[in-house]
Each structure stands twice: as structure tokens, then as C-alpha cells.
A protein has these predicted regions:
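Extended, low-hydrophobicity, polar/charged segments
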Residues: 1-199
Length: 199
């Protein structure tokens, strides 16, 4: 057995001695880095994280690391582009309920700011299917790989002051994957080009 396996077995023995039921799961390595990491999670009805595993028990990971296949999207009835009126509809579910759509038929776009060492700030447009959720740990790791700088923080941009200070000429009620770079031209400390990430 490798040293890594021996350490894992030692942890398992300690937990058993303490009377704890644990599951060893794949986990994000975080700031420590490394190709792989194992985390021991105590099984309980309540806690700060979830364990995702296959029915066979051959794979287990925490939410930050888990890999899965998305559910099948519901196809649109036709491929004809059309404008939708969406007054007072601020969420994916509200748009779907009022327009006879399924969340898998909509693209969700979220703005983030990647803050790197040396006050280098990159605006991010993260695009994902409307029935999915953005895993911010995975997004952080992906952005860190895309740039040659050390990523310090990834912040979702939601507050009105930050939006008004850094974004101009936003299309009313629409932030899409094709949002023009001119919308960030007025920002004093953001890069002037969107990094677009589509899943």
C-alpha cells in the first residue's frame, strides 16, 4: 500500500475507534493543491455538506467535487427565435411559469468578478442551463487554470452599487451570453473584456 493509502487507513481506524460512521469521498484540494484529495465525512441527517454517491457505492464525492451527467433537457417545440415579454419576471421559475417553458430551455447568466493578485480584476459571464446551479468552487478552479495569475477571490456581482459603478448600457432585463464588452468600458479597475464560461 502507498503512503497515501496507509494514512487513509489510519484515519478510518481513528474514526472507528471514536464510534463515528464515515465515508471517504473525493474532495476539492483547495489552496493546498494537488491532483486529488480525499475527505472523510461523518454521515448524519444534518450538516454543512452533502455526500453524492452511486447506488453501487463505487463512487462518492462532496458537492464541490462531484461529477455527474445533467438530466435530459426538454426540447423547444420549434427552432424559431421569438421575443418574449417578461414584465416583473425576475427568476427562471417566474419566466418559465408565465411562458410555458421548462428551466432546461433557458440559459442562466451570472456575473462574477475574479480578483487576482496585483489588483487584476476580470469580469466573468458564467452561462449554464436554467435548471442547473453554478458550482462556485469548480468555477473558481476553472478560472484559476485559465489565467496565469493567482486567483484570490471570486465574487458574484449582485449589488446595485457595484453594477451601476462598473456596468453601462445594460440591456433592460436581459444579461445574455453575448453581452457586449462595451458594457464594462466605464469600469475603472476591471479588465475591459468579458471572460465567457459556458457549461
Amino acid at each position: 500500500a502507498s503512503f497515501y493509502e496507509k494514512v487513509g487507513n489510519a484515519y478510518e481506524n481513528i474514526f472507528k475507534s471514536c464510534g463515528l460512521q464515515t465515508v471517504g469521498v473525493e474532495a476539492d484540494s483547495g489552496a493546498i493543491g494537488g491532483a486529488s484529495s480525499k475527505e472523510f465525512m461523518v454521515t448524519a441527517d444534518a450538516g454543512e455538506d452533502s455526500i453524492l454517491f452511486t447506488q453501487s457505492g463505487s463512487y462518492a464525492a462532496n458537492i464541490e467535487k462531484a461529477v455527474s451527467l445533467p438530466s435530459q433537457p426538454i426540447p423547444l417545440k420549434d427552432n424559431i427565435a421569438e421575443w418574449l415579454e417578461t414584465p416583473h419576471q425576475k427568476t427562471i421559475l417566474e419566466v418559465c411559469d408565465n411562458n410555458n417553458l421548462d428551466p432546461s430551455q433557458i440559459i442562466k447568466v451570472v456575473i462574477f468578478l475574479a480578483q487576482f493578485e496585483g489588483e487584476f480584476n476580470v469580469p466573468i459571464l458564467a452561462c449554464i442551463r436554467g435548471d442547473q446551479h453554478i458550482n462556485e468552487v469548480k468555477l473558481f478552479n476553472l478560472i484559476n487554470k485559465l489565467h496565469n495569475f493567482n486567483l484570490l477571490n471570486l465574487k458574484k456581482i449582485e449589488d446595485k452599487n457595484t453594477i451601476e459603478k462598473n456596468l453601462v448600457d445594460l440591456p433592460l432585463g436581459f444579461i445574455g451570453p453575448d453581452l457586449d464588452n462595451k458594457t464594462i468600458k466605464a469600469s475603472s479597475n476591471w479588465e475591459k473584456k468579458w471572460t465567457r464560461i459556458i457549461d
